[in-house]
Amino acid sequence: NIQDISFDEENPVFVTDKNRHTFDKVVIACGAFSKKLTDKLDEKIPLDTERGYHVHFKDCDHLLSRPVIFSNRGSGITPMEQGLRVVGTVEFGGLDNPLSKSRIKNLIDNAKYMLGDLPDHEDEWLGFRPTLPDFLPVMGPSKNHKNVFYCFGHHHLGWTLGPISGKIVSGMIAKENTNLNLDPYSSARFN
């Protein structure tokens, strides 16, 4: 795990719990955990953590044949190998706050309202989604350190947008012409 970032002249140094690693250039792409490193670089990027919840009901996948969204209750249910996954609540809650039992209860209540009697749920989960106030990711060089690049803040679309964002940032590092105006994604927009 990366504990700190420092510099050997202009070269970034990642300090882990076991060693120090010096690089010519680095990309901070740690999702919701990126803020812990950007704060150490004196960049005030207002990254927050959007926490999305779900619960699983085991051996209930036979109740539905396809995903269903109940917009009037703000919930969705998807049959999966593990059973039924119930989703539909999100909050800004940071990385350290405990899971909200009231949000879990809301998901369970919605599932039972929609499908009737269900067995006890199998597990509870929440995921950390890196979110910025303008809903745009941060991509590009640090405003303070030319050998540090950023690629984070994709909200719940990280799995979708991560690969193309990674390609764009790697092109920037290689000084390739991207033919894109990347100013809206700069970390400087917050300073």
Where are these regions (language model features)?
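Short beta-strand segments that buttress and anchor functional surface loops
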Residues: 14-17, 153
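C-terminal lid/capping helical subdomain adjacent to the catalytic/cofactor pocket in oxidative enzymes
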Residues: 143-191
